[in-house]
Amino acid sequence: MLKLIIPTTMLLPLTWLSKKHMIWINTTTHSLIISPIPLLFFNQANNNLFTYSLSFSSDPLTTPLLMLTTWLLPLMIMASQHHLSNEPPLRKKLYLSMLIILQVSLIMTFTATELMMFYVLFETTLIPTLVIITRWGNQPERLNAGSYFLFYTLVGSLPLLIALIHTHNTLGSLNIMLLTLSSQNLTDSWSNNLMWLAYMMAFMVKMPLYGLHLWLPKAHVEAPIAGSMVLAAVLLKLGGYGMMRLTLILSPLTKHMAYPFLMLSLWGMIMTSSICLRQTDLKSLIAYSSVSHMALVITAILIQTPWSFTGATVLMIAHGLTSSLLFCLANSNYERTHSRIMILSRGLQALLPLMAFWWLAASLANLALPPTINLLGELFVLMASFSWANTTITLTGLNVLITALYSLYMFIMTQRGTLTHHIKNMKPSLTRENMLMLMHLFPLLLLTLNPNIITGFTP
């Protein structure tokens, strides 16, 4: 595990010791060299738990998320270059340091084998993200967004800490493998139900569940490009990862405790998709679409079947790449038009034809067009929820329809139509930007050829 953590940590001295004209080149190339390391963890006999030490281990659920995390750092660095072009070298280095610290804490969170260590690292990821949003965001509202993000996450996580201390007092251990393999036989009592709620609430806020999602659109809209990318692609997946780990430990309870949350996430999925159709702000639309996709993942995890777990894992990876790509595209528009309002940036296909192709590809991936892995994940979840209760097909089917509507609405509003009068001249798309979009789409297309490496705990 250290072969991943140590090189990533060593990016910090690399950043601070680089000359000012070499900062971007050094960090991008070295983080790209580090990114294939998790591919080595895929090569495991019979999908077992691969333990490196007492503290860290990886398994078929962790490894795809590690791959996503490491792949995203060079992309975030590439995307941030224009945003930081007027900053002094010291601030550039500070910004990159925040991204690297966030990367290290995410890697350690995904691989932690001890629940208290997982909790501490889970909370650690909050600090660099908060600094990135509140220091480098564009509008003054970023402070409000930062406080929403901080307090929602903290209030959601405190009950988890109390539940962990309680579990440690009663069982004497918080080792994830030990707790998963030993049968708990939790009875249906008030105290156990409250403990289940305390365990799940932190992750439901992080996912976010509909009703606890108000911090997400604010944080996404006000964050700089790298903040939006890492929030959408990896930080939301922390919630899904935690839920998958802990619902297995609390297994008999989840059966009946899940009902209200299943109903809420299925309903929230429709509501947030419908909200997307009314958005004028491009980043806000993509943020609400993230809430809608994550509601599908919550549904899958709470159904508790091997198929639904597979679907949740695939959907998390697919959504991570797709939403990050959409935020990059929205940012490239914002850098040229200085506005996130879709009506003010219409007709851009005439000026940036190659960018229009990336927009089309991203919109189609977002609406889960075959043969993307987004479709694979959605099909797994749809089939699992249909076999759990036939009536869910009306809600999930409606959601698929609305997703297609708002994805195409987003594409048509930004790319088609007549150009607005205030756009007289516009910079052409840079090679860096095209490369960035390609590096998002490339893994999506490659995973289409071999999706079984990201199917997680296959039955």
Swiss-Prot record:
Task: Name its cellular compartments.
Answer: Mitochondrion inner membrane
**One Pfam family of this protein, by short name?**
Proton_antipo_M
Task: Give the main location.
Answer: mitochondrion
EC number in record: 7.1.1.2
According to its UniProt record, this protein's enzyme class is translocase
GO molecular function annotation: NADH dehydrogenase (ubiquinone) activity; ubiquinone binding
Tell me which Gene Ontology terms the entry assigns under biological process: electron transport coupled proton transport; mitochondrial electron transport, NADH to ubiquinone; mitochondrial respiratory chain complex I assembly
Q: What top-level branch of life does the organism fall under? A: Eukaryota
Chain segments annotated as transmembrane: 22-42, 60-80, 98-118, 145-165, 196-216, 224-244, 257-277, 284-303, 307-329, 350-370, 393-413, 435-455
Which GO cellular component terms, listed alphabetically, does the Swiss-Prot or TrEMBL entry include? Answer: mitochondrial inner membrane
Q: Which reaction does it catalyse?
A: a ubiquinone + NADH + 5 H(+)(in) = a ubiquinol + NAD(+) + 4 H(+)(out)
Ordered alphabetically, the record's keywords are: Electron transport, Membrane, Mitochondrion, Mitochondrion inner membrane, NAD, Respiratory chain, Translocase, Transmembrane, Transmembrane helix, Transport, Ubiquinone
The UniProt entry lists membrane topology as:
Multi-pass membrane protein
* Entry function: Core subunit of the mitochondrial membrane respiratory chain NADH dehydrogenase (Complex I) which catalyzes electron transfer from NADH through the respiratory chain, using ubiquinone as an electron acceptor. Essential for the catalytic activity and assembly of complex I.
| Assembly | Core subunit of respiratory chain NADH dehydrogenase (Complex I) which is composed of 45 different subunits.
The name under which this protein is listed is NADH-ubiquinone oxidoreductase chain 4
Organism whose genome encodes this protein: Hylobates lar
Q: Which gene encodes it?
A: MT-ND4
